[in-house]
Amino acid sequence: MTNIRKSHPLLKIINHSFIDLPTPSNISSWWNFGSLLGICLILQIITGLFLAMHYTSDTSTAFSSVAHICRDVNYGWLIRYMHANGASMFFICLFIHVGRGMYYGSYTFMETWNIGIILMFAVMATAFMGYVLPWGQMSFWGATVITNLLSAIPYIGPTLVEWIWGGFSVDKATLTRFFAFHFILPFIIAALAMVHLLFLHETGSNNPSGLNSDSDKIPFHPYYTMKDLLGMILLILALALLVLFFPDLLGDPDNYTPANPLNTPPHIKPEWYFLFAYAILRSIPNKLGGVLALVLSILILALLPFLHTSKQRSLMFRPITQTLYWVLVADLFTLTWIGGQPVEHPFVIIGQLASILYFSIILILMPISGHIENKILKLN
């Protein structure tokens, strides 16, 4: 008699995805972040659901409802800070996950990679709308500034902005619809993640060497279930450390002031995980140009499969491109720092140079270094 997990229609899917899945025997801890993202998503949906039970999406009561959650709801402060800092952990895992994909050439799985890019946009949209909900100063002005960028779209821009706002400014209608979208998007993200996995399991996982690993596969359970479990414990430990000791470390003090349309904060800036894109946006003096650069800063990932010139898939044995990769990582840290600084000298010029370097490395230098490495190894 066959095992129920191999014959039952539903258990069979779970079995092929998490138990008997043939997995390369040499994948490192950098491959843990996919499962960690899944844990982050589940955590965000659960904490978000409990927050939604007590939150009111009305401009007059939104701010005080968040204060009420923290003061009067049992462990409300814990749920609120787990949700807020859980978003930060989500993005840390997301950036590492994408970075690993870039380093080891996982973008050659085109369908998986493109679904991943769509997922990234969806997660960013969700996080942005979630930041608006507490209705503090930075929530209001962040929403105003970022939605206003759409007015740069020729012809339909201004109408589009008013349509998104549901009026002539960010107001009650905007907050209500942002809450509705913030609630529904994580479930869409969960569905997209399933599609992401579906496409991944069509090809099988990549591995650090970038070589075909069909001859050396091991079952996912117990090897990688245990390995993922360790990652999850460390993730929850890091989140607990952040939530219980430094809950406001990554937040903005301005968001503890209720939203006031008549008083602009001195420095309007988004959450830390958007600062690199915000720095790229600000480094271009033209509004439309800035918006295009902002979108391209993420959309450029879709070009990676076409910009791959090397005969090798992974960067493991490619020292020149490896160096460029780490320069790119350092550049992203620089952009993140610049995004949080005021618009004045020398930050403006540093931001512009860092933005030029970001696009140059991906579009020009990495493809050239791939060619050079082929020549050195006489692979042409």
From Swiss-Prot:
Binding site for heme b b562: 83, 182
Pfam families registered for this protein in UniProt: Cytochrom_B_C (PF00032), Cytochrome_B (PF00033)
Topological relation to the membrane, as annotated: Multi-pass membrane protein
GO molecular function, one term: metal ion binding
Bound cofactor: record note: Binds 2 heme b groups non-covalently.
Residues that coordinate or bind heme b b566: 97, 196
A single GO BP: mitochondrial electron transport, ubiquinol to cytochrome c
Residues holding a ubiquinone: 201
Cofactor(s), by name: heme b
CDD domains documented for this protein: cytochrome_b_C, Cytochrome_b_N
PANTHER family linked: CYTOCHROME B
Other known facts: Heme 1 (or BL or b562) is low-potential and absorbs at about 562 nm, and heme 2 (or BH or b566) is high-potential and absorbs at about 566 nm.
Similarity section: Belongs to the cytochrome b family.
Protein name: Cytochrome b
